[in-house]
């Protein structure tokens, strides 16, 4: 057996049905749709439930999207242990080190984990627990 002699298993491949090509084809005239009725005449729109009140209209509208919402990139204290003692941690440094993918509206430092290094952290926002943990480790926080 050679690569050019390979053939699909018998019955595994079937010919495409060509509907509406004359009565003698077996799939002509109504093309397998039966006679008359809603399903024979055309397609119903997306979400149509046969005249019943559709689900998307039964469920009430809720909320809105605030166009002024600010989304901050989040950094936890545990990930700041990656830096050396006395380092000034800035948003640019966080981007270069791969801790933050994109800056969005800025950076927010949260207090999850334990900080063991003395760092100066510059960010747009800090949680209260993050500020106390950074200062307890001998570091400083600066709001940008």
Curated annotation (Swiss-Prot):
Domain of life: Bacteria
Cited SUPFAM superfamilies: Ribosomal proteins L15p and L18e
Key words, A-Z: Ribonucleoprotein, Ribosomal protein, RNA-binding, rRNA-binding
Stretches the record annotates as Disordered: 1-51
Biased composition (Gly residues): 23-35
GO biological process: translation
Pfam families in the cross-refs: Ribosomal_L27A
GO CC terms of this entry: cytosolic large ribosomal subunit
GO molecular function: rRNA binding; structural constituent of ribosome
InterPro entries, alphabetized: Ribosomal_uL15 (IPR030878), Ribosomal_uL15/eL18 (IPR021131), Ribosomal_uL15/eL18_sf (IPR036227), Ribosomal_uL15_bac-type (IPR005749), Ribosomal_uL15_CS (IPR001196)
NCBIfam families: rplO_bact
Subunit structure: Part of the 50S ribosomal subunit.
Family in the record: Belongs to the universal ribosomal protein uL15 family.
Primary role: Binds to the 23S rRNA.
The name this protein goes by in its record: Large ribosomal subunit protein uL15
Originating species: Limosilactobacillus reuteri (strain DSM 20016)
Taxonomic placement: Bacteria, Bacillati, Bacillota, Bacilli, Lactobacillales
Gene: rplO
């Amino acid at each position: 057996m050679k690569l050019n002699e390979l053939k699909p298993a018998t019955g595994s491949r079937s010919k495409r049905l060509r509907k509406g090509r004359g009565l003698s084809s077996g799939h002509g005239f109504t093309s397998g749709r039966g006679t008359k009725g809603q399903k024979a005449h055309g397609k119903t729109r997306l979400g149509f439930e046969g005249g019943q009140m559709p689900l998307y209209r039964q469920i009430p509208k809720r909320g809105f999207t605030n166009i002024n919402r600010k989304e901050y990139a989040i950094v936890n204290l545990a990930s700041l242990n990656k830096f050396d003692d006395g380092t000034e941690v800035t948003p640019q440094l966080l981007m270069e080190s791969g801790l933050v993918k994109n800056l969005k509206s800025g950076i927010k430092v949260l207090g999850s984990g334990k900080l063991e290094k003395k760092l100066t952290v510059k960010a747009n926002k800090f949680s209260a627990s993050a500020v106390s943990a950074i200062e307890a480790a001998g570091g400083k926080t600066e709001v940008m």
